[in-house]
From Swiss-Prot:
It comes from Pseudomonas putida (strain ATCC 47054 / DSM 6125 / CFBP 8728 / NCIMB 11950 / KT2440). Keywords: Cell membrane, Membrane, Transmembrane, Transmembrane helix. Pfam families: Cons_hypoth698. The lineage of its organism: Bacteria, Pseudomonadati, Pseudomonadota, Gammaproteobacteria, Pseudomonadales. This is UPF0324 membrane protein PP_3661. The keyword S-adenosyl-L-methionine does not apply.
Length: 353
């Protein structure tokens, strides 16, 4: 086995090389994950490359982690942290104010009520009923309330929480989001929910976890419902910024009162402001459509890299400690999204005509 030169001048070079090798390793792994996610058997389930990435990364990280050189750890960590923040910021290019305005007040009100109520219920159930730590409860609630795995990533970065906590939250998104994608169209098409096209779009966009799952579910209802559902879902994504800021304020105040769990601090979510800035850029339509599409594709790949790296840093032994309780919290939230989401949708439609 080669020895590391003792001359300190070599250290930065070796450190940089190891970091780059780690990033390249994650990138190559993400390429394989992207190809795997594109297979019809997986793509037809509405499972995004992000979810496939964290699952595949976790399997590799637990079964073959000794095969990764220690010097690569910095690159893997950068992919799970630094690259993650950049990718979440560029997620803003998928949203425009014009699209949100197209659905009107109905979409905004449904989104705000669903996101707020789901976060509060998730925190209360997770921390008070199932005795989860603050970060795990918040990550699980954010994944259900806002935009699935992307929201988990954003909160994980801001909270600086352990990777296994994100994995548990993503597991909830996978299970209950996939169930919703199949069960919602069945109930809507059978007439059990008594929703018109607008109502179906509001419900699907306002309550299904992942963007891909929303599109998958709504496409089995009608093209019109798919259009409405996608815009409402993007409205929920837009709420990521104010929610992160409010959560940061809450944690900061809890720390001052000496009541916070964990490290009691939240990282400054500069990527949230980047997200908002890119929403404005997309709304002004200053970029050609082809450029926006290319950037969005690169952003999806960067998010896949981040999820893969998080999976590699996850240990199943840590998940087993709180996994059932996190899953139970996700189940309660899913029941709320179905029942409470339907009530909110019908109430808003009745109120606004």
């Amino acid at each position: 086995m080669a020895t590391v030169p003792s001359n300190p001048a070599f250290a930065p070079t070796l450190s940089t090389r190891g970091r780059l090798n780690g990033i390249l390793f994650v990138a190559l792994f993400a390429v394989a994950v992207t190809q795997l996610a594109a297979m019809p058997a997986i793509a037809n389930l509405g499972i995004s490359p992000l979810i496939v990435g964290i699952v595949a990364g976790a399997l590799y990280g637990n079964a073959l982690r000794d095969g990764v050189p220690a010097s690569w750890a910095a690159g893997i960590n950068f992919s799970a942290r630094g690259l993650l923040r950049i990718a979440v910021a560029f997620f803003g290019l998928r949203v425009s104010l014009q699209e949100i305005a197209e659905v009107g007040w109905s979409g905004l009100i449904v989104s705000v009520l669903v996101v707020t109520s789901t976060l509060l219920i998730g925190l209360w159930c997770g921390m008070k009923v199932f005795k989860l730590d603050r970060d795990t409860a918040l990550l699980t609630a954010a994944g259900s309330a806002i935009c699935g795995a992307a929201a988990v990533l954003a909160f994980e970065s801001a909270l600086r929480s352990a990777p296994h906590k994100s994995a548990m939250a993503v597991g909830s998104v996978v299970l209950f989001g996939t169930l919703s994608m199949f069960l919602y169209p069945l109930a809507i098409n059978a007439g059990w929910l008594h929703l018109d096209t607008m109502g179906a779009g509001l419900l699907l966009g306002g309550t299904v976890h992942e963007v891909a799952q929303v599109v998958g579910a709504a496409s089995n209802v009608s093209p019109e419902a798919t259009h409405v559902a996608t815009i409402v879902k993007m409205t929920r994504v837009m709420l990521l910024v104010p929610v992160l800021l409010v959560v940061g304020l809450w944690i900061s105040r809890s720390r001052k009162a000496g009541q916070a769990q964990g490290n009691g601090r939240i990282a400054m979510p500069w990527f949230a402001f980047g997200f908002l800035a890119l929403v404005l850029v997309n709304s002004m339509q200053v970029l050609p459509g082809s450029v926006t599409q290319a950037v969005n594709s690169l952003d999806t790949f960067a998010l896949t890299m981040a999820m893969t790296a998080l999976g590699m840093e996850t240990r199943f032994s840590q998940i087993r400690q709180a996994g059932p309780r996190a899953l139970a919290t996700g189940a309660i939230l899913n029941l709320w999204l179905v029942g409470g989401g339907l009530a909110i949708t019908l109430g808003v439609q009745k109120l606004l005509g």
